[in-house]
Amino acid sequence: MQERLIVAGEEGRRTGRGEMQVGRRSWSRALALAGLLLLLAACRQQAPEPEQPVVEPPRPGPIPQVVEPEPEPRPEEPPGPPELPPLFRDIERRTFQFFWDTTNEVNGLTPDRFPSRPFASIASVGFSLTAYPIGIENGWVSRTQAVDRTLTTLRFLANAKMGPQARGRSGHKGFFYHFLDMQTGERYDSWVELSSVDTGLLLMGVLFAQSYYTGDDPREVEIRELADRIYRRVEWPWLQRRPPLISMGWYPERGFIAHDWKGYNEAMLVYILALGSPTHPVGPEAWEVWTQTYERDWGVFQGQEYLSFGPHFGHQYTHVWIDFRGIRDEYMAMRGIDYFENSRRATYAQRAYAIENPMKWDDYGENVWGLTASDGPQRTTQQFKGEQREFRHYSARGAGLSDAFDDGTIAPTAAVGSIAFAPEIVIPATQEL
């Protein structure tokens, strides 16, 4: 849980820190030069002065008492990351094992859910590719094992059949269908869309693998080459049906999805990947117009002023791979925060919502909180405390200024996945849950 996984944005983070380091070095150099000048002045040979008559010095009087000024208090060092309880080590290991144990060893596809394994999710594959290096770093698998699994996955993705046909294909124009058959790797069913955001989550894992496996071994070289091929073939402008925004996806039976990615949500990574494409990029106006759709999402919720999106995963997913501390676009510069701080505020707002508990669910409180996309009990309407309440099976549950839904289902991933943003409230919540 303590790893910080970074792909895109690393250079910006380094630049920010680099500027700080230059400042410190400049200040240190100035102090050193000043000290050197004082030493030179003290050691410089003085010109002889004319002789003066010897005068008997007066008898010394009482020595005045020197009162040393009290030193100014030094500013406190910022606290380091808290020591994580053993529970988190167990969660980290179990999370890794889920991706390692459930993935199809033949093609590298990871199921959308477990223990039922009806289909693979390409987003899950992206998270699997990210998890394997964590297994290496912790000694849970060898580098050779992880390289083998990663190569299997990337070879399948690079060679998967693409085309406009409704059946027998894994994707089209470089994009992948959201759900694939676990065995064949082809589109699972006619209701499955060609997904821009799930392709984005897949690509984040692909590019993370490319960044991690930097060895000269031919197999690691192949990983980097395959990752490059997979990223380069995605034709981002093809999904700009209403430029410059990017559509959510496409169906071979009925064409492009009528909705574009707008408002603050997990699609941040879609625009980042599309802007950075070396072969089929979108123009910079795509980001500008996308951030212009933020306005309905900025405001105060549960005492926190931030860019709101109800389901908490929207404040987490892009941050898995990009460290946004100190990185601000024009919109966030205007607001005076960065996206990392925004996610921190969103985390506190989720907790405050559970403490207030406006729907009077049982057990909600300061350490029982977190609404995000997850499975639920069932799809039904039932009486609860004298009211008719809607309950759902799978749903993007959330608390915020928009996209809010609460049927009393707390998903532990909402809290645990925010460990980087607010460990001081996430640790007790995780222990309670």
Predicted segment positions?
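Compositionally biased, low-complexity intrinsically disordered regions
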Residues: 1-2, 15-17, 49-50, 61-62
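Ser/Thr/Asn(+Pro)-rich, low-complexity disordered segments
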Residues: 73-433
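Ser/Thr/Pro/Gly-rich low-complexity, intrinsically disordered segments
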Residues: 3-12, 55
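C-terminal motif of bacterial Sec signal peptides marking the signal peptidase cleavage site
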Residues: 40-42
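Post-signal peptide N-terminal segment of mature Sec-exported envelope proteins
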Residues: 49-81
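Bacterial signal peptide processing site
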Residues: 44-46
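Bacterial N-terminal signal peptides that target proteins for export
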Residues: 11-32
